[in-house]
Structure formats: C-alpha cells, structure tokens
Amino acid sequence: LGCEVHLYEMRPHRSTEAHQTADFAELVCSNSLKSESENTAPWLLKQEMRRAGSFLLRDADSSAVPAGHALAVDRVVFSARVAARIAALAGIGTGPGTITIHREEVLALNENDPNTITILASGPLTSPALAAELERLTGAGHLAFYDSISPIVDASSIDMSKVYFAARYDKGTADYINCPFTKEEYDRFLDALTTAEPVPAKSWEQIPTSPAALSSIHPQDCHPERSTAEAKDLRFDAAPKSSENLPLTTDPSPLHYFEGCLPIEETARRGRDTLRFGPMKPVGLTDPKTGRWPYAVVQLRQENLRADSYNLVGFQNHLKFSAQARVLRLIPGLENAAFLRYGQIHRNTYINAPTLLTETLQLRAHPSILIAGQLSGVEGYTESIASGMLAGRYAAALAHGRQPQPAPRLTANGSLTHYITHAESKRFQPANITFDLLPPLEDDLRKKIRDKKERHRIQCDRALAAWNLWLKSSKESPTVNRPSCDTLVETIP
C-alpha cells in the first residue's frame, strides 16, 4: 500500500502468560481458521480477504494441514512464513513499502502527532502498561474474559488400535482421529474431570468482567472444523432436561469465561450429558469395529504438516498439568499419551468498540489511532486477521491523504465491523463472523426461498459483488483535509 511501516513487538524482552516464543504470528490457541465449506460465513470472510490480497491468509493457505472442511495450519510453518515475509520487507532499507522492526515494549502512544498513523493490534494479552495508556486515551475501562488453549499430544504415543479415522457423516476426507467411549468409560472420565484440581486464579486475572461478555454462545469457536449451522447442533442446552443432567458441582472458579470456548471442565459441570451434546458429540462418527456411533467421542486434529502431533478438539481447560495428565489418559487410545502441550487459560482484553471506534476502526477521540484484531472486539484468528487487513487499508488511505471508505455493510468484513461499532455499548461482547451479522434478505425473497443454504448462497454472492466494487472504489476515495503521512506505526506487543 506504499507506506513506511514501523512494527513494534515486545517479545522476547517481555513475554505473556500464553506465548512460548518471540515469533511473529504465533498461534497460541487453536490452529484452525475455521470452515472452508463454500457459502458459509467463515468461508465468505476468507474469500473477501483473498480477493483483497491478504498476505496472512496466503501464508495460512500455504501452511495448511489436513482438517476436513476447515483451514487449519501448521503453526510453526505459518509463523515462519510470516516472519520471512516481514524480514524480506525489513531488509531493503527505509521508505515507502518497507518495514522497520522494533523489538521493544510500547509504553506510550503519541496521539498528537498528525504525521503518524498508529494501528494498535496488541491482542488479547495487551501488556499492563499499554492497557493503561489506552485507558488514558479512551477514558473507558477495558473489558476482560478468559480464552483457552487445548492440549497437544505426540502422535507416536496414541494407541491406534483403539481409535479410528473418520469425518462426521463421512463428509469430506477422514482427517480426524476419533477416540470412542463406552458409557462406563465416559462415566469414569467425567467423574475424574469434574473433580480434578484447577489452577488457582492469579491476582492479575481477576479483572471485573462485563456481564454481557458472559452471555454469548459461539459453539463453532471451539469446533472450528464445523460450519456455523453444524455448530448450532452442538449447543450446550441441547442436552436432555433430565435429573441426570443437572449441574454436577458448583463452579469453583472466580474467572469469567467466554461461553463460546468454555474450559472442558466447566462444560462438564453443567450436566452429565452436556459433553456428549457438545465437544464429545458422537453423532455421525461410526466406529468401524462396531458399526455404530460410540457413546461419546474425543476428536484429535492434525497439528502440523508432519502429522506427528494432534490437538484435542474442544479440550481447552484450566486444570493443573498433573491433573490433566491423569484425566486425559483416561481417554481411550491416550492411556500412554505424551503431551507436548497442556491446556491453559489466559485473559483476553478488548475495548468497548461501540463507544470508542468509528466504522473505519479509528478512535473517535483520536482518529490517527486505529484499533484492530481481538483488542477491537472481534473474536477468532480469521476475524482478527480480517480486522487487521481493514485497519491497514484505512491507515494507508489516511497516510496518503485520502478519506478511508468503510467496507460495505453487505460484506462479511463490513458486517463484522458494523457489529463491533454499532452494538449496544452496555451489552457489548466479542463476535465471530456469522450470517446473523449480515443484512437479511428482503422479506419477499425470504418467503420465496425457504432453503437456508440457498439464502446463504445469495448473501455470499451479494457480499462478494459488493466487496469487489469496494476494492475498486476505495482506491479512488477523495482526499481528506490533513497532511500526508509518511509513517505507519503498527504496535503489536
């Protein structure tokens, strides 16, 4: 986009409670960028990004590992490709089209310099100093909820005689390893899980959370290989309302979790069958040994291109490592599992975007500062990449003296941004991309077309057409009455 970029990264000098490396684009949670099934909302968002030339999505595509209908990446390869791309631009000097890397923590933002456009994309683990600086600028407290990391197991330690490869309902390729449970095995596992010792909450984690942040349910976030429609079949409240499915224990944790990615032990406490109607749902996963669906299933998803490690889908948790080792080895096929990473919880920080941001992701009070990624209130890797892509385009327009044009409401990108900037501020909560965020079809068309898939196809066609026009017109937006900027500063601790 013809800008000189100064990229700030605080690692390795200051790390976070979740990151393990100093690498760019380190994926600390899932390795999935969600569904690639045509005419789904995640697919639409990625299609728009591909048409806009998203480098991060290009690197994700080239780092892909088998994951059925999802785009999952080898996180090490993905990070290395992003780093190589940045290094190539950082090694050609200074001036338009170059990047200068600064390995230092950002402690202050200069909102008064008209010649500097800043993109703040510090993510869910924004450092305390930068969070305090952002609070100084906005005058509003930040919100917080807790995000989770799933365990990873060494593939060579899986007992393949007890598990099987399968895709749900045999759709697509059989990329997932399925660990089947009998009722007795499930009951034993559930009892151990709900009584396992959790990690005590640290003082820095106990930040007041908006009640609204506790009410959103996005099941596909913890089942990213499934479409939004399939994820709705996994609603936790879909379990039978029987006395056997009453909550097992009182929640001992003082933390407030994002409902779309609950720790597995928190889900289990909601009833004995809740896991079987959620992340351990066996429907459509026929066991070749019995010819039937198991009582419950744990799915393992390939973690890297070498296929030497797998993550436990939906098994993010907040248990002590010793407890995890004991409980997870009750999963059939994982009795002798070697865990390369255990599950963890980390705090996720985001701003009250409806109060603070314009539709071009600029702070209302300080328009030379843009907020992108999860800090802006979008939820998920794909949504964060999309948000950063838009912020970069808007910032480049400002730097070249043009008025940035917001992405059209008809598009997935535009609808996601419209949501975070127009939601009810008192009840604002992070959002994944879903068709609920896009404008609905006209009433007469909805009456005429009853099939939901066909409706979604029309929404996707309209979105891509509007996106193509926007890409063309945004290059021709009128100039703004402000000095041209020669520096774009992106701050990513």
Give the positions of each predicted feature:
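Internal hydrophobic alpha-helix adjacent to the cofactor/substrate pocket in enzyme cavities
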Residues: 385-405
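Intrinsic disorder/low-complexity segments
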Residues: 91-98, 111-115, 206-255, 475-493
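C-terminal auxiliary extensions adjacent to catalytic cores
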Residues: 431-475
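A glycine-rich dinucleotide-binding beta-alpha-beta segment and adjacent secondary-structure elements
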Residues: 312-378, 385-387, 405-423, 428-434, ...
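Predominantly flavin-linked oxidoreductase catalytic cores and closely associated redox partners
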Residues: 89-93, 97-219, 251-301, 306, ...
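A conserved beta-strand/loop capping segment in the N-terminal third of enzymes
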Residues: 19-20, 36-83
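Glycine-rich FAD pyrophosphate-binding loop
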Residues: 3-21
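N-terminal phosphate/diphosphate-binding loop that engages ATP/GTP or pyrophosphate donors
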Residues: 15-39
